[in-house]
Amino acid sequence: TTDGAGCCLTACAQRGDMRLIAVVLGCGEDPERFDKAEELLDYGFSGFERFTPEQDSRRLLPITVERGEVSEVRPMIKSIGDCIIKKGRSGSVKYEYTFVEKLEAPVEKGQFLGEFLVTLDGNEVFCSEIVARDEVRRMSFGMYFLRILGELITF
């Protein structure tokens, strides 16, 4: 409580697998701020739910790497976490996968390859980087020569 902010309260509550935090600023005396915090928490628990985005492995196909010792690298979503969405809206969630247009060796493990974006009604609810699962070294001149020679022989 301060003169500028008035009576304030931070409250935390957990129901099932969801934990919420309510912050109340500028309230009157004790009963009011506790009532407002309880009201906010009840609103959150009654109207929202925890949601875990699902990654589609069919969208995470290997990406071509130019001038690499291997010709492609496997992408992966860096982290998947939960988010909070309005109850009953999980069927309206949209997933977007964007990738870099061109990839040239060397590629480091964990290097940024794109973005995994989850939206609901046009609003972002979750975002994570798509990164390289493994490293890809740059092809040496000798290896490049042998690869071309091998292609000529099999032609």
Q: How would you name each of these model-derived features?
A:
Residues 1-155:
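Domain-terminus/edge residues, biased toward the C-terminal soluble/receptor-binding domains
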